[in-house]
Amino acid sequence: MRIQTERFGVLDVPDEAVIRFPQGIPGFPQEKAFVLLPCAEADAFAFLQSIMTPPLAFLLVTPFAFFPDYNAPIHIEQVRHIGIDENNLGEIWTIVTVPDNYHDMTTNLLAPLVINRKKGEAAQVVLEKTNYTTKHRLYPASASTEANGKGGG
């Protein structure tokens, strides 16, 4: 399949690489088909590119690269419809927000994406009874301050 993207131009994507979100993504219910594109600069990052909407691409991160103790209490019932079970736990990614200063990037640990590549389906799951929020910093605040030239010294 050939898709047009704003960020990456025209891409040839094998049909088996398409990841479907049967229930859409909150805020984007009409967007149900994406492709996961690795970020060449950093293994922990990838882009989730919409098949239908060329400008729509989410930056994702594997949360364990920045939060090794991340424990997403996902109930199998929340993701069974995409083929996740005790024998196939899938992959966990989180959506990143990138402000003007990339040192201020945050990720949404409260609502991870669970991807079942074997089945080509995924879901965004909102965690319950957790202290995670939608805005966890990827880099310490001191990195942002130094990048802006406001560090003490």
Swiss-Prot record:
GO biological process per UniProt: bacterial-type flagellum assembly; regulation of translation
Cell compartment(s), UniProt: Cytoplasm
GO cellular component, one term: cytoplasm
InterPro entries named among the record's database cross-references: Flagellar_assembly_factor_FliW, Flagellar_assmbl_FliW_dom_sf
Gene3D superfamilies assigned: BH3618-like
Keywords: Bacterial flagellum biogenesis, Chaperone, Cytoplasm, Translation regulation
Keyword Chaperone: yes
Protein origin, superkingdom: Bacteria
Database matches in PANTHER family: FLAGELLAR ASSEMBLY FACTOR FLIW
Subunit composition and interactions: Interacts with translational regulator CsrA and flagellin(s).
The protein's role, per its UniProt record: Acts as an anti-CsrA protein, binds CsrA and prevents it from repressing translation of its target genes, one of which is flagellin. Binds to flagellin and participates in the assembly of the flagellum.
Family: Belongs to the FliW family.
The name this protein goes by in its record: Flagellar assembly factor FliW
Species of origin: Heliobacterium modesticaldum (strain ATCC 51547 / Ice1)
Lineage of the species this protein comes from: Bacteria, Bacillati, Bacillota, Clostridia, Eubacteriales
Gene name per UniProt: fliW
